[in-house]
Amino acid sequence: MKMNKTRLLEKISIQSGVSLDECGTVFKTFEKVLSEELSRKMYRYGGWILLLTALFVSVTVFSQTTGRKGRPMQTIRGIVIDGDSKFPIPYATVKLSEKEGASTITDSLGRFSIPQVPVGRHTVEAAFMGYEPGIFREILVTSAKEIYLEIPLKESVNELNEVVIRARTNKEEAMNKMATTGARMLSVEEASRYAGGFDDPARLVSAFAGVAPSVSSNGISIHGNAPHLLQWRLEDVEIPNPNHFADIATLGGGILSSLSSQVLGNSDFFTGAFPAEYGNAVSGVFDMKLRNGNNQKNENTIQVGIMGIDVASEGPLSKKHKASYIFNYRYSTTGLLNLEGGTMDYQDLNLKLNFPTQKAGTFSVWGTSLIDKFTSDFEKNTEKWDYWGDRSESRDKQYMAAGGVSHRYFFNNDASLKTTIAATYSQLDGGATLFNHSMESTPYMDLDSKYTNLIFTTTFNRKFSNRFTNKTGFTYTNMFYKMDLSIAPYEAEPLEIVSQGKGNTSLISAYNSSSVGLTERWTLNAGIYGQLLTLNNKWSVEPRVGLKWQATPKTTFALAYGMYSRMEKMDVYFVKTKSTGNQSVNKDLDFTKAQHIMLSFGYKISDRMNLKIEPYIQFLHDVPVMADSSYSVLNRSDFYVEDALVNKGRGRNVGIDITFERFLEKGLYYMISGSWFDSRYRGGDGVWYNTKFNRNYVINGLIGKEWMLGRNKQNILSVNLKLTLQGGDRYSPIDLEATMNHPDKEVQYDETKAFSKQYSPMLIGNYTVSYRINKRKVSHEFAVKGLNFTGAKEHYGHEYNVKTGKIDVSDNSTILTNVSYKLEF
């Protein structure tokens, strides 16, 4: 079949307003990547298929846009609010800093609209008398979607005639104004732009100082802590792990977040010493928000790529009452990726409905859910069996959902009450079967777990003055559980119960947190948090305090301290052993507890360039460990525990995080972040060891460049690169004698030297290349995203080779490439 590529490119050039040469350059780039990535999947004409699909949609559906000349325009809308009370600020000035005359005044409800904004990058400034100006820099404006901004302004603590004008940008600090150190706001736009982000917020934060990334998993290890010690929050509610195939490869992680960047709003990420409103977390908190849909017009997105299909839509439910909806659905089968080990199918759905009223406050209905299915490959040719795992066949089905109804009511312009009633659900149904050389099967593992949480949470926020703001909150979580895990101790032996339980219990928590402006330069954040687990009546009271000093308009110093605690996964409390029969051996376990101390130094080199240095130390105590053993939950990565534990372990993490960042300006941004740390723990044997996640160092380098192309400079070519150098995986020396004496030759380790060995450092490279074509009311984007193009290997342990009689390293180099086409209209 012959195709006239020149003629096709001419049509695209006419439709997009891009010169023929530029179209040819972009096409060759995508054609090369497509042919390399898709040819091995037998898609010979993959490049042509994607090109023709884009061309067909562009020509047949949006042909009416041809003939329109000039740079496409868009509208920037939003609201200006008080950063402490969240109440709208009427009659504030909002303008585009680089466009003369593009300014407006907010109405009586704090709303603003700036029409006729050319596509491209723009900086939005908001100002009001008595407040420090707020700046949102380099906002990406496209032709297909309106931009909606929520701009918080901080009221000055001084009298009007003493106000020092100090503009605050949207990326310099967390959205939560009571955060003192260890906090970072991340935007949805960054998630789609940063190399290696894969539109996944969990992978995005791996670029930040203090976080050690993985390739095969998006588990978040902060300062050497295990990923399961992080808390996931959505709309102010703790939710189950929101990742696809959660907790299978790494407890606390998965392969990809179910929360799409299509529906996420700006969120906060904490790496330590977080404020009093956050509890039941030891290492950090990922506080995510869903954005409201456009309440003025319908907007839609369709994305097709190797990883699957993605459909999103938003718009008004009632223009009269300003109600809106937004949803996103995604389906993928990684059979397209030709992954070794099995086939993964997953899908997810996210939504939010927003209903503002004139007198009764604002109601919202929100939710997220996922369905995952995994089937392992099984080699039926017994001559190809090299390892014990080659004889096993496994299955896995997972379900997760979280949703709720939230209500916010303003009593006046300085006090509000937000209440949420929510429910979460998670289910894991899995099993594994072993085959002998006669192809006779015996069950090796059987798992069926269901967890349902009913949650009531309420927060009262009051701004007493420009110096003093207080938040008080209460949360009641009723937890229903049903779990049944059985594992065969050895091959061909009957299954034995590992954990089993059915019932319900409650976690009750409350907090009080205040922010006090002592002077214009000194701010004190202090509070207290407490929680009670009714399962065993264990409780904890935790003070938090932070002090921030604005030494100069460019220099800040901060110090924060806090106590923290976290309950274990529910299955841990119901572990059963042979000696105890039906008695649960861990039911009286106390919380894992920690104390964080963090210093912070920030220097604003210029309006676009920041330096931040944060040394820290964390002490962990009452850590569940196994008596007379090196085992500790601080190293836990498996989805189950099968031993009796006691709260006699300790841990210590000490290090320093450094970030040097240049925000996007004139199409260029870059960031260098580094972390040097030492993470150690004391087991039940009283000996101190390296933790499993003690890589010692992580260095990230990010850089990206954008070019405006096309006749009217309305199209955007973006190239982004990320390189990560980090210490290698840790492991324990092999106990060869114990391994050879094991009935199944399962590799045994010398636990007296736990995690004393380390593999070579890892160099992980990621890239993102995209080209966006902006037409009137429609936008096309072609993107190629690569993960681990450097081929860094991750190590998963060791396996006994039945053919050679030797023990081999189990490792893998996961390399992913996603080629996609996105249509916004």
List each model region and its residues.
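Surface-exposed extracellular loop regions of Gram-negative outer-membrane beta-barrel proteins
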Residues: 238, 243, 380-381, 427, ...
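Outer membrane beta-barrel strand-and-loop segments of large Gram-negative receptors
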Residues: 449, 453-457, 498-511, 586, ...
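Short, acidic Ser/Thr/Gly-rich low-complexity loop/linker segments typical of extracellular
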Residues: 99-111
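Gram-negative outer-membrane beta-barrel transporters
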Residues: 617-619, 640, 644-727
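Short, acidic, small-residue-rich periplasmic hinge/interaction motif at the N-terminus
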Residues: 65-69, 73, 79-85, 92-97, ...
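C-terminal beta-signal and adjacent terminal beta-strands/loops
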Residues: 724-746, 760-766, 771-825
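A beta-strand signature from Gram-negative outer-membrane beta-barrel systems
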Residues: 255-299, 310
